[in-house]
Amino acid sequence: MKRALFVAEKNDVAKGVAAILSNGTANRREGRSKFNKIYTLNTELFGQQTAISVTSVSGHMMNFQFHENMSNWQTASMVELFRAPVRHVVTPEMKLIEQTLREQAQRHDILVVWTDCDREGEAIGAEIVKVCRDSNRRLDIFRARFSEITKAAITRAARNLIRLDEKTVAAVDCRSELDLRIGSAFTRLQTLHLRNRFRDLLGQNDTSQVISYGSCQFPTLGFVTDRYKMIENFVSEPFWKLIVEHTRESHKVEFLWDRNRLFDRDTVDILHDECKETKEAHVEKVAKKPKSKWRPQALDTVELEKLGISKLRMSAKQTMQVAEKLYSKGFISYPRTETNKFPAGLNLTPLVQQQTQSNIWGDFANEVLQNGVNPRNGRKSDEAHPPIHPLKFTEKHQLQGDDWKVYELVVRHFLACVSQDAQGEETMVNLTVGTEKFHASGLRIRDMGYLKVYVYEKWGNRLLPTYTEGERFTDFELKIGDGKTQAPDFLTEADLISLMDKYGIGTDATHAEHIEKIKTREYIGVRPDGKLIPSFLGLALVDGYDDMGFAMSKPDLRANLEIGLKEICDGRRQKQEVLDEQIGKYRAIFVESERKIGVLSQSLQRYLDKNNQAGGGPGGPGGGGGPPRGPGGGGGGGPTGPPAPPKPPAKPRGRPPRKSISPAVKNGHDDPENDTIVTLSEVFGSMSNPKPARKPRAPRKSAAPKEQEEEEEVFCQCPEPMRAVTKVVQKEGPNKGKKFYTCSLPYTSSEKCNFFKWA
């Protein structure tokens, strides 16, 4: 009888696979690690009875490390970290699992990898293969592809085994090696320099604060600091607007100005006076049209994380940890997916049928079955996993706390997705007073549709009284409203994930990990309301590299790497090609950064000085570390961190220009004939320069009359422009006597345009 070893990524998955393939009769025994059991069973594999042992690892077993001669921070050359040899070794905490795999590999003929079907899962599978093959070179290696722990999915995977995707493994190895080299070099550079300059703050021994760098975490930090600075530098600007209020049928209706708002009070006063002269409002148009509120698209990882943050008040990391637990226990499908459209061949009706048992949403599930299962699909597919959806029914008392909250979210989202849009009727009333146009809208809900189950969104009636097209009325009140422009809000974790997804920083599977890392390193803090604020250390790091002329906190460099990794996965580029290219870019920046490193300490000193004067700022430390699975990135943060940020200190405006003339630096080859010469101009020349945040407009000054040597020919904005007429402000006030241009048509004309310009 053949003997096969199945190895899953987690013990819960191993347990589920064994239970399904044995119909619940598998035997359990202990492995070397108490957390990773061994399950034994007999079943058919490749058309013949096979004795199978099922065990597991706990995420990544191995990582890239430098040799011992590069481990001393004081003596090893930092720039050599870009070309020094590295090795792929089993980490100390995984030694017991390694021992189990070696022992089991010797006793089996076939190895089947049952890790998660994503990039990291493929790389973990390659680590399992390496350990097992070192023990038994004769092993025949296969890979099972599945997206859920169900009988159908596991049985299908066991009958359709494939080989590991070596291109995907190469992409992960490329990223891991780059993270080690880049993170180690910049972490040592900035930590040693800042420790030396700020001994009291950071200490000087091996347990002191590590100022770590990661090529994904730094752009993530950059998004937070950019928003913080945008808010701090925001200049509020006053504005004015016209409002028409009218009461009918006991409803007070506010008609909004079609111009929205203007930033010049005098202009608004003039337009207000013109409207007052008319003394009546004319209903130009009353239109009714169907209005729909679309049900949500099928659920992918990014949307699950964002919903977990905004609706469940959980962090992205917590949401994904719970989702993975639910997946391992067979409650939901694989939660790390970029797909938001269900494949045509997937029968969703049985999944809806299961949920009819619920005393919470069972009636809605029955309604979905009566109307027909009709998923709203997006356009994305990773060609590996379906959207996240429930696999089996459970009740609230069977899941506790966050487990239930995430399960409920997945179920409600799924039922909403496969149901019907909410339907209503919108009424739009267009009003004219003098030369100015206004509008009001109402909404009457006719069918709540998906909103009956999707409690995370609201859509309410907004009733309007009856208006008749062409009618006129005088019992209205014309007002001038005022306000000030508001700064954007601080980012939430959901906002940050959206930006990371938009600019290609990390993947859907790693966004939460990167955010947790900059929290742990205390580069950002989280306010009680969930808003993210940089610490002054985070601000100083970003400013320091900006002042050197390197946009390290911008997404370009890392996004470019993510593109390279995808090209490796697709077979369009080789691992070594991408590795050499990225090492060349970052090494060029490192050489210049090392030369200008004093700028970094100057940046931190400015914030320290400002903090001492102002007594700190609104931020606070974060908490929680990232899970072992996924990318590294240059070391971990220390247990404590500097205070939160003050307002950014005053410093010369603008950034020093990037220097295109710099010493040529070589890549990491030992053979000088094969070295690629890379200059800083080449590093940044291939990507668009990041645009600085737009400076807010200064408040506009009141317009003044123009002195003209000859009469200006001015035309209005009618479809067929006519020469504008000149009028004079008659109202008492600072603008009395000023001339302005307006449309030549009479105020009573419906064709008169809204043109206005000071003369």
Swiss-Prot record:
Highest taxon in the source lineage: Eukaryota
Region (Disordered): 609-715
Family membership noted in the UniProt record: Belongs to the type IA topoisomerase family.
Biased composition (Pro residues): 640-649
GO molecular function: DNA binding; DNA topoisomerase type I (single strand cut, ATP-independent) activity; zinc ion binding
Species of the source: Caenorhabditis elegans
Broad EC category: isomerase
Name of protein: DNA topoisomerase 3
Pfam families: Topoisom_bac, Toprim, Zn_ribbon_GRF
EC number(s) stated in the UniProt entry for this protein: 5.6.2.1
Compositional bias ranges of the Gly residues kind: 614-639
Keyword Isomerase: yes
Catalytic activity: ATP-independent breakage of single-stranded DNA, followed by passage and rejoining
Subcellular location, record wording: Nucleus
Occurrences of domain Toprim (ranges): 3-147
Keywords: DNA-binding, Isomerase, Metal-binding, Nucleus, Topoisomerase, Zinc, Zinc-finger
Residues of the Topo IA-type catalytic domain: 165-590
UniProt: Zn(2+) binding residues: C716, C718, C743, C753
Listed CDD domains: TOP1Ac, TOPRIM_TopoIA_TopoIII
